[in-house]
């Protein structure tokens, strides 16, 4: 991958900034034309919280199961190290197929009236008490529906 990307940078085709997953913040993705995520599904889902819905993301599975049974399934990763060069060319030439994936986002209004907006979630969104042992009291409202609950929390999932 680094050879392919270095050649694109040297040829003036792209500008490249690399950031480790542990150091990523929203500001890293402002004004980007493309974000390339190298890793597995967990890497992509954690990074996706910081990327707005208009920025294309190219997932590259760095450790596919075809090479190692303990590798990543790569459900969200449409590219692999072996196909990266041609996949990147397709993206840069506007020939790649874009898949728009739904994301969940919650707005939580506390009893004191404070509004908290969650990060966008690619597949699951868990709302629960910060203390795992404590139950959560909450109301779920949508349209005319208004449900009061007391439980461990609530889990929302996309169909993906």
Provide a role label for each language-model segment:
Residues 42-48, 148:
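Short glycine/serine/threonine-rich phosphate/pyrophosphate-binding segments
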Residues 63-155:
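Catalytic core of DAGKc-family lipid kinases
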Residues 1-38, 50, 70-98, 118-119:
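ATP/NTP phosphate-donor binding region
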Residues 48-62:
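A short, gly/pro- and small-residue-rich
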Residues 40-43, 63:
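Short glycine-rich anion-binding loops that position phosphate/pyrophosphate groups of nucleotides
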Residues 24, 158-160:
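Metal-ion/cofactor- or nucleotide/acyl-coenzyme-handling active-site neighborhoods
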Residues 38-41, 160:
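Glycine-rich beta-strand-to-loop/alpha-helix junction loops that act as flexible
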